[in-house]
């Protein structure tokens, strides 16, 4: 009946005491010569680019984001890549500041639910979109993300309060839940989706890091993230034949 798919202190210089001595002549020429022979350490040290606040945007839509009744899918928010063009990152880590999302949810009646001889019954259901932080991201042996059921226990929990199953709480935590209770009389219904989630504040900083093992793989996909990945879970529950399509734009503000 159910189906699931995936997708840097302060530096201090101590001054030495200067004692005046008579009868002693010093040759400063040698000292000046030594200064000239000293290597210019600053010029040989590679200065890293300054980290700046930037924003990266990602649109999640298409056939893979269409949910049939009683189904769910899991995906991730793509982080910036280590490139020269902005938005980018200049380190193997970034500070996650805030994520905003805005989009549309479209609920459609299934073809088999149409009644020819009378009015169609209402389609009722619950849609959930959950933003989750993965503290220690890594691809499992199956090569996929944890499913909705594996992370939250069962899709039916969307009717109440979602929580991460005890076995996975050390790795995952919920950052935001968007929930819409739907009652559809016509064939289609459009619902607005929007929200903002703070990832860092004055008391806590959320940093993400990357492996960046090879030049070609210095990107922001889940497989290259080693700390604090952002996952998104979508779920549509309904007893009637129907489908839910999502188009959601994510904007991630970060220091990188």
UniProtKB/Swiss-Prot annotation:
Keywords: DNA-binding, Host cell membrane, Host cytoplasm, Host membrane, Host nucleus, Host-virus interaction, Membrane, Transport, Viral movement protein. A motif (Nuclear localization signal) lies at residues 81-96. Residues 150-187 are annotated as: Interaction with Arabidopsis thaliana NSI protein. The keyword Nucleotide-binding does not apply. A motif (Bipartite nuclear localization signal) lies at residues 21-42. Residues 1-46 are annotated as: Disordered. GO terms for molecular function: single-stranded DNA binding; structural molecule activity. It is found in: Host nucleus; Host cytoplasm; Host cell membrane. A motif (Nuclear export signal) lies at residues 177-198. Pfam families: Gemini_coat. GO terms for cellular component: host cell; host cell cytoplasm; host cell nucleus; host cell plasma membrane; membrane; viral capsid. It comes from the Viruses. Its main location: host cell. Residues 1-16 have a biased composition (Polar residues). One of its GO terms (biological process) is transport of virus in host, cell to cell. It is a peripheral membrane protein. Binds to the genomic viral ssDNA, shuttles it into and out of the cell nucleus. Begomoviruses use 2 proteins to transport their DNA from cell to cell. The nuclear shuttle protein (NSP) shuttles it between nucleus and cytoplasm and the movement protein (MP) probably transports the DNA-NSP complex to the cell periphery and facilitates movement across the cell wall. Belongs to the begomovirus nuclear shuttle protein family. Binds to single-stranded and double-stranded viral DNA. Interacts with the host nuclear shuttle interacting (NSI) protein. This interaction may allow NSP to recruit NSI monomers to the viral genome and thus regulate nuclear export of viral genome by NSP. This is Nuclear shuttle protein. It comes from Squash leaf curl virus (SLCV).
């Amino acid at each position: 009946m159910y189906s699931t798919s995936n997708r840097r202190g302060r530096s201090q210089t101590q001054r030495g005491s200067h004692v005046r001595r008579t009868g002693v002549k010093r040759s400063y020429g040698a000292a000046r010569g030594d200064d000239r022979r000293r290597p210019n350490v600053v010029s040989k040290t590679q200065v890293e680019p300054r980290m700046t606040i930037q924003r990266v945007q990602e649109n999640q839509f298409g056939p893979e984001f269409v949910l049939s009744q009683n189904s769910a899918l899991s995906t991730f928010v793509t982080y910036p890549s280590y490139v020269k063009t902005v938005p980018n990152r200049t380190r193997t880590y970034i500070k996650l500041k805030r994520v905003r999302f805005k989009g549309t949810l479209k609920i459609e009646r299934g073809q088999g639910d149409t009644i020819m001889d009378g009015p169609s019954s209402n389609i009722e259901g619950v849609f959930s979109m959950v933003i989750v932080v993965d503290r220690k991201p890594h691809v499992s042996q199956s090569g996929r993300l944890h499913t909705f059921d594996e992370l939250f226990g069962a899709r039916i929990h969307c009717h109440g309060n979602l929580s991460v199953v005890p076995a996975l709480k050390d790795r995952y935590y919920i950052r935001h839940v968007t929930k819409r209770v739907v009652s559809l009389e016509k064939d289609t219904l459009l619902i607005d989706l929007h929200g903002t989630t703070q990832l860092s504040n004055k008391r806590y900083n959320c940093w993400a890091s990357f492996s960046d093992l090879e030049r070609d793989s210095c990107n922001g996909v889940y497989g290259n993230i080693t700390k604090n990945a952002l996952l998104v879970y979508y779920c549509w529950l309904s007893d009637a034949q129907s489908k839910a399509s999502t188009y959601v734009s994510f904007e991630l503000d970060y220091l990188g």
